[in-house]
Amino acid sequence: MTPKLVIYTDGACRGNPGPGGWGALLMYGDKKKEIMGGDLATTNNRMELMAAIQALEALNKPTKAELHTDSQYVMKGVTQWIHGWKAKGWKTADKSPVKNVDLWQRLDAARARHEVDWRWVKGHAGHVHNERADELARLGMLKTLGERGSGKAV
């Protein structure tokens, strides 16, 4: 049986807005890849979106993936809200511009290349892979700030 690609993503922010980071853990069978990054001036929602975007953009061919996020914003946005936003020219129900439209459009393009099964996971609930994605997001933020991380290899 062919293993499936499983992805866990998370974002972190010190202040909102403030410096932030994103992290993603990609697992295929017994192989793992960890990616992270950050921004000096951002929001938690932008970092949550970036984690999913970067994970999907890291895939070099169309892939069937299961993507786990602890962000209700990302989960509801990508599975419910995005269809209406696109139909209304990237406007909300009250005709105002969609917040973070640049990232939503990028996520929409990234997911179009793949077959993604979106899954919500409760954050900070002891789920080992989600906790690792959270740690990667914090490390991404620390690296962006030029601070020392936890000392764990990434």
Swiss-Prot record:
Annotated residues for binding of Mg(2+) 2: D10, D134
GO MF annotations, alphabetized: magnesium ion binding; nucleic acid binding; RNA-DNA hybrid ribonuclease activity
Domain RNase H type-1: 1-142
Keyword Chaperone belongs to the record: no
Catalytic reaction equation(s): Endonucleolytic cleavage to 5'-phosphomonoester
Protein name as annotated: Ribonuclease H
Cellular component aspect of the GO annotation: cytoplasm
Family indicated by similarity: Belongs to the RNase H family.
PANTHER family listed in its UniProt record: RIBONUCLEASE H1 (PTHR10642:SF26)
Subunit structure: Monomer.
Localization terms from the record: Cytoplasm
Keywords in alphabetical order: Cytoplasm, Endonuclease, Hydrolase, Magnesium, Metal-binding, Nuclease
InterPro entries per record: RNase_H, RNaseH-like_sf, RNaseH_domain, RNaseH_sf, RNaseHI
EC id: 3.1.26.4
Leader sequence residues: none
SUPFAM superfamilies given in the database record: Ribonuclease H-like (SSF53098)
Free-text function comment from the UniProt entry: Endonuclease that specifically degrades the RNA of RNA-DNA hybrids.
Superkingdom of origin organism: Bacteria
